[in-house]
Regions:
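Short, hinge-like loop/turn segments at secondary-structure boundaries
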Residues: 52-56, 84-86, 134-138
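Active-site neighborhoods of divalent-metal-dependent phosphate/nucleic-acid chemistry enzymes
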Residues: 65-116, 120-122
Length: 139
């Protein structure tokens, strides 16, 4: 089971400049097993692209399934965001930096409930979710 991140789905559904690479990566992943979206990704894609039912139908048409975030993943996300805030403070950076809870929920879901994550945000997920297989669409 491989999870897919919002940025890649926006490329696919919005026909963005990375759409071809994202499509090739998704096809490869689907060839080896299920590809899933978690609650956060479904919410973010809906917010970015339109009506929920239409978005979920489009995801279903692409062969993606829904995988809700489990309690253990939610707890891990909170722990990782706490580390992020502590690192930012220690480095003298503003705590209100771009990383919000949704990023940590997506990462924890992929780490604990899946076998990898398709994303364009390689650095963040490798840094905070050690052991997570990060799959980046090649452009």
């Amino acid at each position: 089971v491989i999870a897919i991140d919002t940025s890649v789905l926006i490329d696919l559904l919005g026909d963005g400049e990375g759409a071809d690479a994202a499509e090739a990566c998704l096809r490869l992943a689907l060839g080896s097993g299920p590809v899933v979206v978690c609650d956060v990704v479904a919410s973010e894609v809906t917010a970015g692209l339109g009506h929920g039912a239409e978005v979920m139908d489009a995801l279903d048409d692409m062969g993606l399934t829904f995988s809700p975030i489990e309690q253990r993943s939610a707890v891990r996300a909170g722990e990782m965001q706490r580390k992020y805030v502590q690192r930012a403070r220690a480095a003298g950076q503003p705590v209100g930096t771009p990383r919000t809870m949704p990023d940590f929920l997506v990462g924890a879901h992929a780490l604990l409930q899946c076998n990898g994550l398709i994303t364009r945000d390689e650095g963040f997920f490798r840094d905070y979710f050690k052991g997570l297989k990060v799959i980046v669409p090649k452009t």
